[in-house]
């Protein structure tokens, strides 16, 4: 090993010692080192040279025992600290003492792959270990023992900060976010948005890692100072700024003075840190939805970059990030517009609408005002008009109801006010008269319900116009005057997000279940979307469904969810329930993958039907599976008989007591492998049904028999006469078949009530209906064959029609075929 030093002068005028260090590594690493030379020189400010193998020197110097054969000489030249760290890194990749695999959440992939891999490079510079991405979610770390342990500890620290989702103190957080944002935008790539959504504590740690390199910190500070200088130049050059600005950028400057006290609640617009010339042609809008909803993940699939993103010295070629996200109330987290002539009116319109929406105004009102006044109108005028329209919309119900009640009073011919509390959406102009006594107000409280025109609301009334003194007046205290400020209307999304604040833990007791229960197969996507109001994929809904069946004794429970639902997405809530259920072996992910930005996913409903066919289980879903009815007879039978629908009442999972209808089996029998035959009823009358609905018994009108009140109707000859019900009871006993009670009562004439005075009088019995004609039988057969087209069902249909010559009810015949 050889080393030496020469004097070199640095850029700041001080002379620093340039160290030359030579050492050997195994000769088989020569090709690896040749390929890695540019990367090593980029990571460490050194000059790296591969000198050659020892055999070359042995031939000239004839010293065979100086070094072992098969090794090569390397030379590093640079500052002492840089040479030492580069040497440790090179020896680590050539002769590693330790190799480790460190896993991390896939949502953190942006840290190691994003910002043009700058954070990964700084981690290597800081620890001198070779850190590389083995796969998404896995890091490969190798090198000397101490560097590997340091790198692994640093990565684990990042993971802990990410999982804890910690925030910095309020006085430090804005500065860290701004500094991190400048750094990330300097190294822009397709992971930029995901990096901006990281917790602020993790951002601070990444900045400290990056700023260990003095050059990075100097660049950031220089860029920040350039920003300030550009701001001053732009303030002086107001004419040029207005020429290149848009109504959205003008809106920011005008609203700074109006909403200075609510800077955190209103979104702001930030200009990109470029040169003055670029600043006039490039505008950037950053929605603070990413800060207000920092806990919500962002889907990596929503970011697409047109072409590769490289570090460009030419500032004219500014990379543009297009964000394609699902429609939501907080769209377009980042929008970069290149050049003023490229801004379309549609983009301008969308930016304006989204800006006012984030301030809490209704989208309908915002679009109406912009359409009326035009999107080129002064932003403050747009804001004032939007506020006026919002107030009008909220005041319309009050004015309409007030005029309606006044018209009703005039129609009744009374001049007195109704003695109830009336809320009037106007401000009190004068103080309450001193003649009104408190007792008068108490008296009207009781008189309210007697008046049909009183409002149900107990809001205090306010009187605007003077009222004659001879009438009873109701005046609210002056301090309870109606407030002109209107809060934005409550939405279902807000209710759902508030419900998530209530903590819920999935706890399944470790106790034996019931062996006689069927396998439960849950359509995870259907359940999650149902609990999330069809807007959010609520993993809590899946957990609630699993907990419900677990408490009922089911232990064979399977939930199917597509694999892509594991990605971070603001519309997927409480994803930790998916991980918990997967660890318990209850959750199964259906395959999905992404190829060139396009998602390829298998149909998860097919997995539900396949498993139900193999296990005889019940599918929990609100889907009808119409597209699978014709797939196979077994699937059709599953769809008809083994789908269990559900509903959510908040966080309460509810199932119907009669899953197959009013006359079907009860829920417990439906879920049991061996249901109780005494309690199971078919949805239709059974095959041995002897009672037919009344309209099937009735003969033609011209053949109706004329009998007296107490005269029994003559039975048709040649047929057994049904036994008459016994008199002396208030109502007949219901038959044991699935026929409902009201059908059975139709067999008795409604004109003949059961009274104690008629105990011994025989009741009239219905006559038997005539047999079907051949044409009727043929029509029924054709109808049944349309319902059951299978060849094996034709013989059964013929047998049923032959065995029941009086039956004309298509539903009853269909039930017999199913039985």
Curated annotation (Swiss-Prot):
Q: Which Pfam families match?
A: KH_N4BP1_1st, KH_N4BP1_2nd, RNase_Zc3h12a, UBA_N4BP1, UBA_N4BP1_C
What subcellular compartments does it reside in? Cytoplasm, Cytosol; Nucleus; Nucleus, Nucleolus; Nucleus, PML body
Residues annotated as domain KH-like: 80-164
What is the protein's major site of localization? cytoplasm
Domain RNase NYN, which positions? 517-669
According to UniProt, the name of this protein is NEDD4-binding protein 1
Describe the function of this protein: Potent suppressor of cytokine production that acts as a regulator of innate immune signaling and inflammation. Acts as a key negative regulator of select cytokine and chemokine responses elicited by TRIF-independent Toll-like receptors (TLRs), thereby limiting inflammatory cytokine responses to minor insults. Has ribonuclease activity.
Decide whether keyword Kinase is in the record.
no
Region CoCUN: start-end pairs: 772-819
Output the CDD domains linked to this UniProt entry. KH-I_N4BP1, KH-I_N4BP1_like_rpt1, PIN_N4BP1-like
Task: Name the InterPro entries on file.
Answer: KH_N4BP1_1st (IPR056629), KH_N4BP1_2nd (IPR056630), RNase_Zc3h12_NYN (IPR021869), UBA_N4BP1 (IPR056631), UBA_N4BP1_C (IPR056578), ZC3H12/N4BP1_RNase_Reg (IPR051101)
């Amino acid at each position: 090993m050889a080393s030496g030093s020469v004097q070199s002068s640095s850029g700041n005028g001080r002379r620093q010692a340039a160290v030359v260090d030579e050492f050997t590594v195994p000769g088989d690493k020569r090709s690896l080192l040749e390929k890695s030379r540019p990367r090593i020189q980029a990571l460490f400010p050194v000059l790296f040279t591969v000198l050659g193998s020892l055999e070359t020197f042995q031939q000239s110097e004839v010293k065979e025992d100086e070094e072992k054969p098969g090794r090569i000489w390397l030379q590093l030249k640079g500052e002492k600290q840089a040479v030492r760290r580069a040497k440790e890194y090179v020896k680590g990749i050539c002769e590693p003492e330790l190799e480790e695999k460190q896993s991390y959440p896939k949502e953190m992939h942006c840290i190691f792959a994003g910002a043009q891999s700058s954070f990964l490079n700084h981690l290597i510079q800081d620890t001198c270990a070779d850190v590389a991405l083995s796969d998404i979610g896995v890091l490969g770390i190798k090198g000397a023992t101490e560097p590997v342990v340091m790198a692994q500890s640093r990565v684990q620290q990042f993971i802990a900060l990410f999982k804890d989702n910690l925030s910095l103190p309020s006085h430090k957080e804005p500065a860290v976010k701004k500094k991190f944002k400048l750094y990330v935008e300097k190294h822009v790539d397709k992971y930029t948005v995901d990096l901006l959504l990281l917790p602020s504590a993790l951002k601070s740690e990444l900045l400290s890692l990056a700023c260990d390199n003095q050059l990075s910190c100097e660049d950031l500070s220089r860029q920040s100072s350039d920003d300030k200088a550009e701001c001053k130049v732009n303030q002086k050059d107001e004419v040029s700024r207005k020429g290149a600005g848009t109504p959205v950028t003008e809106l920011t400057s005008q609203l700074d003075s109006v909403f200075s006290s609510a800077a955190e609640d209103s979104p702001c617009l930030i200009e990109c840190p470029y040169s003055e010339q670029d600043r006039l042609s490039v505008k950037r809008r950053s929605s603070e939805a990413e800060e207000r909803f920092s806990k919500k993940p962002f889907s990596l699939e929503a970011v697409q970059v047109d072409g590769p993103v490289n570090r460009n010295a030419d500032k004219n070629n500014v990379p543009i990030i297009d964000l394609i996200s699902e429609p939501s109330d907080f769209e377009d987290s980042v929008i970069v517009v290149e050049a003023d002539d490229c801004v379309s009116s549609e983009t301008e319109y969308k930016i304006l609408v989204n800006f006012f929406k984030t301030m809490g105004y209704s989208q309908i009102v915002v679009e109406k005002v912009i359409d009326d006044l035009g999107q080129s109108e002064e932003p403050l005028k747009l804001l004032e008009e939007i506020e006026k329209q919002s107030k009008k919309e909220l005041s319309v119900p009050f004015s309409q109801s007030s005029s309606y009640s006044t018209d009703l009073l005039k129609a009744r011919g009374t001049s007195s006010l109704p003695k109830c509390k009336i809320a009037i959406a106007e401000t009190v102009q004068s103080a309450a008269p001193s003649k009104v006594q408190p007792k008068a107000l108490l008296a009207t409280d009781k008189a309210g319900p007697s008046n049909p025109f009183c409002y149900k609301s107990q809001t205090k009334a306010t009187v605007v116009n003077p009222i004659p003194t001879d009438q009873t007046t109701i005046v609210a205290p002056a301090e309870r005057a109606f407030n002109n400020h209107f809060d934005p209307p409550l939405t279902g999304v807000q209710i759902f997000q508030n419900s998530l604040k209530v903590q819920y833990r999935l706890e399944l007791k470790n106790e034996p279940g019931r062996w006689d229960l069927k396998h439960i197969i849950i359509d995870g996507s259907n359940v999650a979307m149902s609990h999330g109001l069809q807007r959010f994929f609520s993993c809590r809904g899946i957990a609630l469904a699993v907990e419900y069946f677990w408490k009922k004794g089911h232990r064979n429970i399977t939930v199917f969810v597509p694999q892509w639902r594991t990605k971070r997405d603001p519309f997927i809530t409480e994803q930790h329930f998916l991980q918990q259920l997967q660890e318990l072996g209850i959750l199964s992910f259906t395959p999905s993958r992404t190829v060139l930005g396009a998602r390829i996913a298998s149909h998860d409903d097919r997995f539900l039907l396949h498993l139900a066919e193999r296990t005889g289980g019940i599918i929990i879903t609100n889907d009808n599976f119409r597209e699978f009815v014709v797939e196979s007879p077994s699937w059709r039978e599953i769809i008809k008989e083994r789908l269990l629908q559900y509903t959510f009442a908040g966080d309460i999972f509810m199932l119907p007591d009669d899953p197959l209808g009013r006359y079907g089996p009860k829920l417990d029998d439906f879920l049991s492998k061996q249901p109780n035959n005494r309690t199971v009823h078919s949805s239709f009358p059974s095959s041995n049904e002897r009672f037919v609905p009344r309209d099937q018994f009735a003969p033609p009108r011209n053949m109706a028999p004329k009998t007296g009140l107490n005269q029994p109707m003559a039975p048709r000859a040649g047929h057994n006469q049904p036994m008459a019900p016994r008199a002396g009871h208030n109502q007949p006993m219901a038959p044991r078949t699935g026929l409902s009670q009201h059908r059975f009562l139709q067999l008795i004439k409604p004109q003949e009530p059961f009274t104690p005075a008629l105990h011994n009088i025989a009741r009239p019995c219905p006559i038997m209906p005539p047999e079907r004609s051949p044409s009727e039988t043929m029509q029924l057969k054709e109808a049944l064959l349309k319902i059951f087209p299978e060849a094996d069902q034709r013989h059964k249909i013929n047998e049923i029609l032959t065995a029941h010559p009086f039956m004309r009810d298509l539903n009853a015949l269909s039930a017999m075929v199913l039985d």
